[in-house]
Amino acid sequence: MRFIFPTIAVLLEASMIVLFGFFVKYETEQNAIQQPNSTNSTKVDRSLELYPLFQDVHVMIFVGFGFLMTFLKKYGFSSVGINLLIAALGLQWGTFVQGMVHRHGQTIYIGIKNMINADFSTATVLISFGAVLGKISPTQMLIMTIIEITVFAGNEYVVGEIFQASDIGASMTIHAFGAYFGLAVAGVLYRTGLRKGHEKEESEYHSDLFAMIGTLFLWMFWPSFNSAIAETAEEQYLAIINTYLSLVACVLTAYAMSSLVGHRGKLDMVHIQNATLAGGVAVGTCADMKIHPYGSLIIGSIAGMVSVLGFRFLTPCLTAKLRIHDTCGVHNLHGLPGVVGGLSSIVAILLGVSTASSMTMQAAALGSSIGSAIAGGLITGLILRFIVRGQPSKDNFFDDSVYWEVPKEKELDNV
């Protein structure tokens, strides 16, 4: 940790400096080249109109995702701290890789929209991080960030440019992709003994309360996430309204289902922290379609129920039968709702509410996102396990003290 992690971190940042030096310029420089006799103020003003949406998405990345993972009582430092680390790397690498893919190797002109797209690419890694939370080293996470964003950019290009599929809120390309990539990595890195649980894989009253803060930030800003890259004002309007309605419906069904499957009808905080967000994930693909307000409510309701049922029945099955330990339950918050989102878009096109794509291309996009995620995740897992290595021992899983200076229990009691 003392030498390997700092060396890799510094080398990666040095690489970013070199790459940005050769390939990245300000968007205003492109405007000056294309229209040398005109002022750039108009285009800059239009770009700055996206800044509030960028900030909303930024809050989701750093505060929402970070605090959502603080439910583990002895892993809060890593949940928020490593989230910041990989997000900082992911934003730089995402800007470069996506720029290279879409500009076909030419100069990248960075603007607010590029920064939003970089946030999106980083979100995939943070989703995957939830599947391996507590079982992976910071060094391994840096390498995983580089590989995953590269695979993500390739799949996003295939879905958007080749298949011409509609996925404005990225239910398929971000949520489903990130979840199944993370599950594939978790499967390769699986350690025997996790099937029966780990003594440190527990929450406490205050850690669950911190995680709920992350939930609330994500819930409030999800309409911005789904509408940030809308091409027209009408599409943005539809995305905001549809996401809002799906989220509120999701909350009701998530609470109801949690009580139904819970012990003595009690609510489970794990369900509430996660399943209440599933509506935002599920409606993402068809958020800019005229699916009618009741359609958004239906999608959100289904997502809330599917997510809770996944936590209650599917997660234990994945661990016991398939040897895939999903720490945060990303399969239930992002994976299954992401699939619901892809299927919802197919149904929407079938019913004639959208002509943005075809059912075949939407199905192909869903298959490509899941397939590339699993393949990329398996390869990444093998690289992390046998080449990068450094995974903590099973006894040190879910423990901040392995990588952080942690106050002793007596010091905490005196505070």
Curated annotation (Swiss-Prot):
One GO CC term on file: membrane
Top-level taxon of the source organism: Eukaryota
Name of the featured protein: Ammonium transporter Rh type A
Summary of the function given for this chain in its UniProt record: Component of the ankyrin-1 complex, a multiprotein complex involved in the stability and shape of the erythrocyte membrane. Heterotrimer with RHCE (RHAG)2(RHCE), that transports ammonium and its related derivative methylammonium, in both neutral and ionic forms, across the erythrocyte membrane. The transport of NH4(+) is electrogenic and masks the NH3 transport. Also, may act as a CO2 channel. Moreover in erythrocyte, regulates RHD membrane expression and is associated with rhesus blood group antigen expression.
Membrane topology: Multi-pass membrane protein
GO molecular function: ammonium channel activity; carbon dioxide transmembrane transporter activity; leak channel activity; methylammonium transmembrane transporter activity
Location (main, coarse): membrane
Catalysed reactions listed for this entry: methylamine(out) = methylamine(in); NH4(+)(in) = NH4(+)(out); CO2(out) = CO2(in)
Compartmental location: Membrane
SUPFAM superfamilies tied to this protein: Ammonium transporter (SSF111352)
A Pfam family recorded for this sequence: Ammonium_transp
Regions of this protein lying in the Extracellular compartment: 24-51, 98-115, 164-167, 230-236, 288-290, 354-363
Glycan attachment sites: 37, 40
